[in-house]
Amino acid sequence: MRIYYNDPTLEALKKSSTGILLSLLLCTTVIVSLFYLLKIIRKQKELAEIKNDLISNITHEFKTPIATISTAVEAIENFNVLEDTEKTKRYLLMSSAQLKKLHQMVEKLLETATLDSEKLILKKESVDLVGLISRIVKKYKILTEKNISLSSNIHYRIQSLDIFHVENAISNLIDNAIKYGGQQIEVNINSVLNYTVITVVDDGKGIEKNQQERVFDKFYRIPKGNRHDVKGFGIGLYYSKKIIEKHGGTIQLTSQTDTTIFKINLPNE
């Protein structure tokens, strides 16, 4: 004769196991949802900071030429323009230069909108890339006190490049090195297999790992407050990446404590 004894605790657990599993599932769902919500809030906060920084910098960039033009016009109003023609000419040239600067800034912002679409048509032709980059380097040597060197081992023309856009893309990288990098900037042009490789190297303090992927995002600037001492809207590197990709190439960033390298790979078409 056998006697069976049912443990009431075990029986209660069996009966409530479904409820326990559902409760655990609900708790897990709530926790995951909270983490997802926090991620969205953090992302929205970052976007808000980028937007505010962009608006602040655009305002600052536009205020400078507008203030210069206003000063020039006011000066012309307050002296005899007919008697002092040289001064009048100087103020008019100053105003014209600032108006041209405003036009370029507006064009740059509008052009950014076309990069993600098929509206941007590249006018490709045979290009002496070494000569092109040499002219860019010479221009920046005049504009900055930093040391910029150029080296190359290629002696051929690239058959299919849009000179205007490629020049702007490379200029953006050198301009970025001047603004954010150290005193030494190296521009190298080399042939690797079927590609022409262009590197822009500077000895600055580098870019933090968590910022490196985002520097190519549209309007993104490394968050350091309202850096009006550094000009720009945060579209230069984005523009460069899009233009290089439209040429079938790639652009990469490698940054350590004392070195930052931007590397462009262009196919030798």
What are these regions (language model features)?
Residues G236, S240:
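Short alpha-helical Gxxx[C/S/T] motif in the catalytic ATP-binding
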Residues Q183, G248-L253:
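Conserved glycine-rich
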Residues I207-R221:
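Short conserved segment of the HATPase_c
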Residues K123-K138:
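A conserved beta-strand-to-alpha-helix junction within the catalytic ATP-binding
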Residues K123-S126, N147-R157, L161, V192-L193:
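Conserved catalytic submotifs in the C-terminal HATPase_c
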Residues A97-L102:
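Short alpha-helical segment of the dimerization/phosphotransfer core of two-component systems
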Residues Q184-N194:
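Short beta-strand/loop element within the Bergerat-fold HATPase_c
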